[in-house]
Structures are given as structure tokens and as C-alpha cells.
Amino acid sequence: MRLSHVLLGTAAAAGVLASPTPNDYVVHERRAVLPRSWTEEKRLDKASILPMRIGLTQSNLDRGHDLLMEISDPRSSRYGQHLSVEEVHSLFAPSQETVDRVRAWLESEGIAGDRISQSSNEQFLQFDASAAEVERLLGTEYYLYTHQGSGKSHIACREYHVPHSLQRHIDYITPGIKLLEVEGVKKARSIEKRSFRSPLPPILERLTLPLSELLGNTLLCDVAITPLCISALYNITRGSKATKGNELGIFEDLGDVYSQEDLNLFFSTFAQQIPQGTHPILKAVDGAQAPTSVTNAGPESDLDFQISYPIIWPQNSILFQTDDPNYTANYNFSGFLNTFLDAIDGSYCSEISPLDPPYPNPADGGYKGQLQCGVYQPPKVLSISYGGAEADLPIAYQRRQCAEWMKLGLQGVSVVVASGDSGVEGRNGDPTPTECLGTEGKVFAPDFPATCPYLTTVGGTYLPLGADPRKDEEVAVTSFPSGGGFSNIYERADYQQQAVEDYFSRADPGYPFYESVDNSSFAENGGIYNRIGRAYPDVAAIADNVVIFNKGMPTLIGGTSAAAPVFAAILTRINEERLAVGKSTVGFVNPVLYAHPEVFNDITQGSNPGCGMQGFSAATGWDPVTGLGTPNYPALLDLFMSLP
């Protein structure tokens, strides 16, 4: 599995190195397995010049976690006292000790001080050096690697060493063990949208009445979900406030772009209180473009705005359309979300991540500007309906990104993500055709970025045939399995400890399990899931039979892509009410939600199968299929209005 490709913080080197290292040096990163699409070729010429970048460890990450829990805990006297952008940057900047010690090491090994510079965001030390110098410095060997699909070459090593005393000061070094994904090579995407389309059911296709008349009540909510159905399900009243700065942020990428014509058709049919021409505020990242023509409209973007606008109106949305059309037409990078995070946080910004699209884009028609760094303010609520398999990215990459979500939480930002549409399985390509993990493809594969403990992850439900949205319960979605389970990287969060233990006491699935952090003891003793991992989803919302307009036609759409913007829109509405009385935004909501499960509609039926198993089952209380349940807007509003 891919997670095993990178081992961080190993206590001692294994195997024999061509260049011996001092006794106090240890392996910092090692690639255990060469990806199948790459071939190791000859040693790099020792005279070759390498642009070296040393990522410095950020300060106070543990303190940041504790502080976020404190200002997010409803029992804390500091609840809601969020930090400013400047306070967050200052808190996490690499310490001067880290900078000085790493620089001193480089100079002691013959890298002259006038060759070393620090990046403008203070996160990296950088210098140019010959391959011979770097191999001696890191006790490694550099090779040329060839990508089998494209013939393109890349420079990397199998492993590298740093002094034991400096391990805690160094995040990672490039060029290092990572192999770049190659532009222009067709392959299965490791990142995907959380939605799929289906034809209108026959009952709607046969009727000759206008959809607005047909669906102007809740009688057919079991067949087609409209804004009226969502309001009935969650007791959502019509909005009346639009505080400047409280717009709902929606992330889009992979070339999925909304159509204004589709929005107008949806508004005129299902949300006539919203004027024609209403559109999100575009904040384009790295050459992205929106909107598009109706013939090229993306179902994901159309869904996100059509399902959320009726909830938040008269408030508006902000569209963070990300990456230039050249890249998004054939997204061949295993990394994801970092170019967006760069754009809203200059301190995070880096031009060297080998897993993300590089800018300026040298390709014909590519974005020729510099990588956008810190050019936009983050929204107070952000909805993300994209993701992939946790096993497809290095642990260090995911932990650095997860720490960034923590920083946004400290600033009062709520980040809501879809849990995925593959149950307990992963998706796309590696490591097996079934997308499950382990040598036999039976180990459950958790989702990315849904497992980060600083995000609010939303699973999917549907309304059974014949059910009344005003009085009948939803069940876990069945047309696809809602993503849920336990991380192989992150430990179970403190805020969910009791809820998860209660689940195991009431509805233990009986599967063999293992206990692992950072994939340290993956699949030991025949286990198929990580019992102590961060559990997800946190909550759920409607995720099937949703009516939208796409490419000018009404259609049904499903996926946890629908659930995430519904819950995000509800948080935006709650923020409106808190801001109106001088209170802060709700920020990171998970500690409050787990402390008050009574504000949810508990979902007790359904499961999320995968890997040849039944997966997990919905149960009373929290479960790894539908989380705490679906929102009851008035109860959620009363709860958050009662807090400072």
C-alpha cells in the first residue's frame, strides 16, 4: 500500500549505504517500494547541480491543537475567542533555534553561509549544491528515474539521513524520496468528485405538469429532493440576513465549473425568491476560470450552488475555482488542495511541493503567473466535496495539510467535507483493483481529507420510498455506500472518544482490528480496520435523488457531494444569527456537536459495505456510517446561540 512507501522518523538506518554516515545520523525518509510506473536508472552525475530545499518544522503544533480544543469547547471560558491571521502565523513560524541549528549544520558540512537563504514565508532553507555535496551531506545516492508512461525523468533518492539531533527541526528535504507525477499521462484520478448523475425517475418523466407545480409540495420528496424537501427534513426557515464577510465558501477543481444558465433555471423553478443572474463571487486560484457554457457545465459545481443557495439566501457564496484549465483537463498530480491553501494562507505557500501542480505552468495555454500566495481571505464556512484515498498520499503531506485546517479553525473557520461515496473502500488505482488495502485487498481504506480531525465530515442519507420528510426518518444511503470508518494516520480525537466507545459497546462489528498511528502497525494480527483511528463521518445529510439543472436539463444527482454543502449552508445561517447579536462565528464545531448529540436526528438503519464485507452499521448514537445523524436546524441554532 502507498502509505508504507514513506517511513518517517526511523530510529536507525537499515541496509547498506554506498556513502557511510556518521553514527549520530538517522534515516529521515525512506521509500520502501518503488511505484510501479517508475524505473530506477543510472546514478546521477556527481557534478549535477541540485536546487535543495529543507522544509523546517513548524513551531507549537501541539500547542495549536490544545488551543483549538480550548476555544472550541462549549465548557471553556475561552470559547469563541478566535485568533487573528497574524497571531496564527506568529504562533507556528519555525523557531529561530530551528533556523539557526539547521543553518549551522549546513555550514559545518561545507555549505557556505552566503549560499544559504531562507524563503520569504520562513518555512524553508534553500541552496544549490552539486550531487556529490548533497550525497555526502545526506548519506545517500541520487538516481535518475524514468516514468514508464511518458519517458520523462526525475531525480530522487531511496532514502536520506540527517543528524538525530536535527530530526525534530526538519520536516522534509527535496529533492528527496518523492517521485513527481507526470503531466500529460492518462491515468485513473486519485482524487474525485463526490457525485454521480442518474436519469429522472419514470414518475417525473411521464408527468406533463411543470416541475415547479409538480414539486411545489413535499408529496414527492421520496422520489426527488428539492429545496422545499430539505427545509422540511431539517426544519430550516427562510433566511433574512446577509452579513458582509459571512459568504459561504465553496471549493471547486478538476475542471468542474458551474453554468449561470443552469443556476437561473434552478432559481426560476425551485427558488423564485432568488433573482435571476444571482451568482457566486469568483475568487479564481492560479488561472482558474468560471462560469462556463451550459453545454460544458459540471454537475458538481451546479449541485453545490443549487443545493446551498436556497438555504443561505439572501447571503451569497464565494467560489474558489482552483487550478488552470490546462491542468484540470487532465489532473495527473497525486496531491490536492494545496494550491487552494496557498492562496488563502501565504505562510503555507511553497513552490516546491512535488505532488502539486507547479506554477507558472510551462505548457501551452497554461497559467503563466506565479503561484498565488495569500491573496484571499478564508471564508467563515468552507464546503469541499472532493477527496480520495488516504493511502494515496505520504503521511507528511497529509499531516502538514491537516495542520493547516487546524490553523483555519483557530481563526474561526468551519471546514466541511464530504465523507466519500465508496463505503469502507478507497478508490482509483492503487493499491488493488478493489481499492481496499493489504496483501489480500481486505483491509478497509479510509478517505482523504475526511479523516483529518480538524474537519467536519458529512456522510450521506436518503428518504425511503413512501416516507414523509416532515415525520419519517432518513436511512443511510443505499444507491452507493456512504464513506466512513477509521483513519490509519490520525488517532481518535478526544472530542469523539466517548461516542465511539459507546458505538463499539452497542454495535461492535466483530471484525478483527489493529491499533495504529501513522500506519505504524498496519493490519497487524489480521486486522481489517484501525480501532483507535480518527472516526468519521461526524454528521450526515441528504445525499441522493437531489434534483438539479445540469446542461440545461433537470436531473437527479447523488453523492456525499450533496450532503457537505447542505451542512455547510446551515452553519452559515447559524453564523448570521450569532453575528447579528455581536457573537463570533462558530468556527471548529466538532467539540460542540459531540457534546450535544440531542440536536441531531439519529439515523439507525443502513450500512456502508465494501472490501467484500458489510462494512459498518448505523446504530443508536454516533456510528461510522451517518455520524451523529442529520441536522435539526432549530435545535442547532438554539444550541449555538446559547454559547458565548
From Swiss-Prot:
Optimum pH is about 5.5. Its cofactor is Ca(2+). Transmembrane segments: none annotated. One of its GO terms (biological process) is proteolysis. It is found in: Secreted, Extracellular space. Residues 224-643 form the Peptidase S53 domain. Its main location: secreted. This is Tripeptidyl-peptidase sed1. It comes from Aspergillus fumigatus (strain ATCC MYA-4609 / CBS 101355 / FGSC A1100 / Af293). The lineage of its organism: Eukaryota, Fungi, Dikarya, Ascomycota, Pezizomycotina.
